[in-house]
Amino acid sequence: MAITQNYGTGRRKSSTARVFLRKGTGNITVNNRPLDEFFGRETARMIVRQPLELTKNTESFDILVTASGGGTTGQAGAIRLGIARALVEYDETLKSELRKAGFMTRDAREVERKKVGLHKARRATQFSKR
């Protein structure tokens, strides 16, 4: 018998997360490591759990995540979006609740490119009057 699972893709900054949602006991595995081991910061773990806590599904799913690219914050945001999309695939009625909380929106902010003649994207050399 095939395992029924729901899939969601999430992206943030330069990170991508592929999320597989299965009926289970609440285990979240990121790149074959438990969530608490993968993310050192509590904030990142909270971000990942937000959609599940909002929909009161913390104990009803096992989540398998493959995250790549970017850093901790970007990956946490990507996983959150992926989980939200997978939950909507599982149950369409959760969409309005997740949308209202802002979990269905792809954060479009990207790093601004460095400009020629400047130190960074906007940082110029110090202005000298004389």
UniProtKB/Swiss-Prot annotation:
InterPro entries: Ribosomal_Su5_D2-typ_SF, Ribosomal_uS9, Ribosomal_uS9_bac/plastid, Ribosomal_uS9_CS, Ribsml_uS5_D2-typ_fold_subgr. This is Small ribosomal subunit protein uS9. Keywords: Ribonucleoprotein, Ribosomal protein. The keyword Magnesium does not apply. The keyword rRNA-binding does not apply. It comes from Xanthomonas campestris pv. campestris (strain ATCC 33913 / DSM 3586 / NCPPB 528 / LMG 568 / P 25). HAMAP family: Ribosomal_uS9_B (MF_00532_B). GO terms for cellular component: cytosolic small ribosomal subunit. GO terms for biological process: translation. The gene is rpsI. Pfam families: Ribosomal_S9. Belongs to the universal ribosomal protein uS9 family. One of its GO terms (molecular function) is RNA binding.
